Amino acid sequence: MIGTGRFARDIAATVDIRTAVSRALTPHVALGRVIMLVNPLSGGVGPNAASEAAGIFADYALEAAIIALEGGQFDVQVQQALDAGPDALFVLAGDGTARAVASRAGPAGPLIAPLPGGTMNMLPRALYGTSDWKSALRQALEEGAEQSVAGGEVSDGRIRESFFCAAILGAPALWAPAREAVREGKFGLAWAYGRRALRRAFSGRLRFSLDGRADRRAEALVLISPMISKAIDEHAGLEAAVMNTADALQAFRLAAHAVFDGWRQDPAVTTRSIQQATVRARSRIPSVIDGEPVLLRHVIKVRFIRTAFRALVPNPPTRAEGV
């Protein structure tokens, strides 16, 4: 059945389409009833996404409800979708929304399918290997299987943010917009972002402790989930990459690696696997959490989550774009 609009109306007014289908569903999990949350205002979604998704769902023998997220109703709509207990919950929205839904679902919730509807789409690209949400949706419907996704949690005492790809803490977080601009071929914009990042590169250093060890200092700390790390095993923990620069020339070299190529090979970077970390600074800490810029307070706690949520991903899983 297909429904669009407000949640209550979606659940009540759907129509069974099991006799009008033409494509086979995945044999790996049962998908009898699914829900899709859509934010039509997100940059990668568009005003026609709900009707386009309904057209795709109509090709399969399942019951589907499509809910358009509304300002001020986000928390209620997400909780209603989770409480409905669907076999899978699809999310076509921005990066932050996808993370929030996956985090709230947790390992006991329904299978989560975060489709690429944001700007950077780090989590969807890691799971589906594409930035085309329609292709990712069909992959999930036709080849989907359950996969436990590990991640981390960052808390500054005021906000608590989950991440499933990477968290960049410190001045090099300012390079994330430049890197994305380069990927999109917007070199003028990348240069502008790069100049801003260099101006702020020495505004403060971090003090941090990994797994309760003695404090150290660094320019930045990057925490990478096992889903995309090329350096650690799946259940070993988070990869902690410590970035240090001694002078402006080193900072520029590290910035170039961050924008253009493999930063891990830079001599200013050291890595290890961890379960938890504490990070401090004299001022608020610029950060990027799964592609979204966040300004955190001056004391941060980070912890590894072995099973953060259960994802609906292609079988065999798409190889994530590792870092």
Task: Enumerate the predicted regions with their spans.
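ATP/nucleoside-binding phosphotransfer catalytic cores, i.e., glycine-rich phosphate-binding loops
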Residues: I2-A24, H235, V242-V323
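Conserved Motif II region of HX4D acyltransferases
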Residues: G96-T97, A173, G291
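Short glycine/serine/threonine-rich phosphate/pyrophosphate-binding segments
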Residues: T97-V101, M122
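A general beta-strand register signal
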Residues: A58, S155, S209-G212, R280, ...
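Active-site beta-loop-alpha substructure in enzyme catalytic cores
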Residues: R216-Q250
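Cofactor-binding loop segments of dinucleotide-utilizing enzymes, especially the Rossmann-like FAD-
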Residues: N39-L41, L69, G117, M243-T245, ...
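ATP/NTP phosphate-donor binding region
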Residues: M1-L92, R99, K134-L137, T318-V323
